[in-house]
Amino acid sequence: MKNLTWQNPEQLFVAQVLINKVKSKCCGIKGYYKGKASAPFIPSFQGAYKKGDWTISGSFAVVGGGGKASFDDGLGMFDSMVMGQVHTISGGQITPNMYSINSAMDGSQFIYGVQLGLSYQVNDWLGVFAGGRMNYFTGGYEGFLTATAHSNIPTYGGMELVGIDLDCDQTGWGLTPILGADVKLGKWNIGLKYEFMTSLNLENKTKKAEVRAMGTAMGDEGNPLADYKDGVNTPSDIPALLTAAVGYEFLPTLRATLEYHHFFDKAAGMANDKQKALKHGTHEILIGAEWDIAKQLTISGGYQRTDYGLADDFQSDISFSCDSYSLGFGAAIKMTKHLTMNIAYFWTNYDDYTKKISETTKNVYSRTNKVFGLGVDYKF
């Protein structure tokens, strides 16, 4: 038997809007920093060729990263440096009219994956899979901050209190071995997959990474941009992933699946060993169902809960996570004998995370996310 399929059951492209928000309170002064990441088109492709009991499959997709985000008003971690400088030169008093800040930050992270694998149908109830994925990371940060003292601070009026310039590109690559199995027992379907940890180091190609205090450039010690200096390599491993799913066919037209994902985050290398601060690796629980309303139409719905095991030392303005739950809905429309169109929408609600810096300083991290997907399956 020969069969060639070009498909993506999830998406041909995705339109995504992700909003990152950081609320900061330092020295009695509150700040609100909003970053918007909008991705109007993220393509992905999958294909499979089957002959007898063997199937070879391949795909190309954006498999990770946070996309592009722009913080037009900068970040609280940089503004707090300004407030600390004002606190020092003003004798401990800080009011907004003592200084002015002009600041902005853009960041991007994309992991592109090319995957190839081979499946074998062992018997009527067992199929196995082995393959791998090549991951290529590209991203970086570009931003600036200029803070100037006002004339109501004696001696320092008009002087640059803090200056920051950052222009850094990052690249890296790594290989992910993948194993899987599929078991079919009557109306029950069990799926297992394990993705091994991917060793990934990001190398900086930096044009600027300078922090100035009172006009003097800082050295590496205590410099918040030391990790972004030219040539620095930063570990950014992709954690190993174990997934297990159990599906049941209630009716020939009605199916449901319960699924569990575990990311072994604490065993992966990350910048400044921040993974050690996590309480545990990421847990994800998913449940979904699909119903064949008619011969040409299938609808589906699902729920996902994600728990990262977060801790204060893991979170920063540049990189943070929030526990969440997602609701999704989709439909598959059979257009012809060979062509099926898939549409989907999901919305994610994130829990706010509060990080206490000191008795007078805290950051609150939050997000919102909405995604629309469109895909096609074509069987030759």
What annotation goes with each model-predicted range?
Residues 18-38:
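Surface-exposed strand-loop-strand hairpins of Gram-negative outer-membrane beta-barrel proteins
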